[in-house]
Regions:
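Proline-aspartate-enriched helix->loop->beta-strand connector
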Residues: 21, 232-238
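Di-metal (Zn2+ and/or Mg2+/Mn2+) metal-binding site signature of metallo-dependent hydrolases
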Residues: 1-14, 213-226
């Protein structure tokens, strides 16, 4: 989805002629510019009559629609310059025109009760299933649920006004990678109302179980316990920067992840302290998290901050049986 921490760094990569790409997948929600009249800066909301949940249009599809959006003048800043999303689209079009990008595609799930949606460019030994975003209807115009801040919910207002951040994050692309008989879940920036919505859409099925769970939204407190219980992983990975005002991952997210994991020794791995800069500006990378699978066994590894001669990584085979292997 088009939050800056998920796409802005790719602009430089897309503009680099030494890189080639197959497809760019996205959730269909563009980031409009200043004073365009677009709801939530994302699209057009459905009517709010009745106080129920609302939906929003999807207005980005392929590279042709990207070109149309750029020509519309709706992706400009207050100073009439391209906003960051426009810069991303221009970089994608440049890569396409140079033969370095194959396609841009919107990725959604239309019928949660239907057959699994598997990305076409994955194979039988390693497949990627698309679980979200789930459209509000299996047919007709492609609209997504507009999500609210759960802190604003009251007994008389179960669906308060949706917000830009909860809607863009809540409609993250969610993927489950299956390698052999092992599964990895990637939940993007899903939040609590989105996780509840997905549970309702898929009920009574549970497509979210996985041995390894990439924690949603870098370890935010905005999560639904029932979602964590449905995933029930052996290991959870939190990916977040060391700086910033959000202090992710938060203690409740890490604690809940451990409590609702499987096994006596659930693993919670975090990239929070991932690098160090000395007085000369030299960056030393550490705390890297690595997952390896042969289809029947998964090994998680975390790089030591100060590797010894005999050991660079801490390694854990899943399900982890503890430091003494049950002996």
């Amino acid at each position: 989805h088009f939050d800056q921490d998920h796409y802005y760094g790719l602009i430089r990569v897309l503009n680099d002629p030494s890189f080639e790409f197959g497809k760019i997948y996205h959730n269909g929600l563009p980031r409009y510019g200043f004073n365009t009249g677009k709801d939530l800066n994302l699209g057009t909301l459905s009517s709010s009559s009745g106080g129920g949940p609302r939906s929003i249009t999807t207005e980005l599809r392929d590279l042709a629609s990207a070109q149309t959006l750029l020509a519309s003048g709706l992706l400009l800043t207050e100073n009439h310059n391209d906003n960051n999303f426009a810069l991303f689209l221009r970089a994608a079009l440049k890569a396409s025109n140079e033969g370095r990008l194959g396609a841009m595609r919107m990725l959604v799930k239309r019928n949660p009760g239907g057959t699994a949606k598997i990305l076409s460019d994955t194979g039988p030994d390693c497949s990627i299933e698309v679980l979200a975003p789930v459209t509000t209807s299996p047919t007709g115009p492609i609209r997504l649920r507009a999500f609210h801040d759960p802190h604003k919910v009251t007994a008389t207002a179960p669906f308060p006004s949706p917000t830009e951040s909860h809607t863009i994050n809540g409609n993250s692309i969610v993927l489950r990678l299956r390698h052999g008989n092992k599964e990895f879940l990637f939940g993007g920036d899903l939040n609590q109302p989105a996780q509840k919505y997905l549970a309702e859409k898929y009920a009574p099925a549970n497509p979210f179980s996985a041995e390894v769970n990439k924690a949603c939204h870098h370890g935010s407190s905005d999560f639904e316990l029932e979602y964590l219980k449905a995933v029930h992983p052996c290991a959870t990975v939190f990916s977040s920067g060391d700086a910033g005002s959000y202090d992710h991952p938060l203690p409740d997210a890490m604690g809940a992840a451990a409590k609702h994991s499987s096994g006596e020794f659930p693993l919670v791995l975090s990239t929070e302290l991932a690098r160090e800069t000395d007085s000369k500006g030299k960056i030393k990378l550490m705390g890297h998290i690595n997952a390896r699978s042969n289809g029947s066994t998964i090994v998680m590894a975390q790089k030591k901050e100060k590797p010894s001669e005999s050991k660079t990584w801490y390694t854990f085979e899943l399900p982890y049986a503890g430091p003494f292997g049950g002996h």
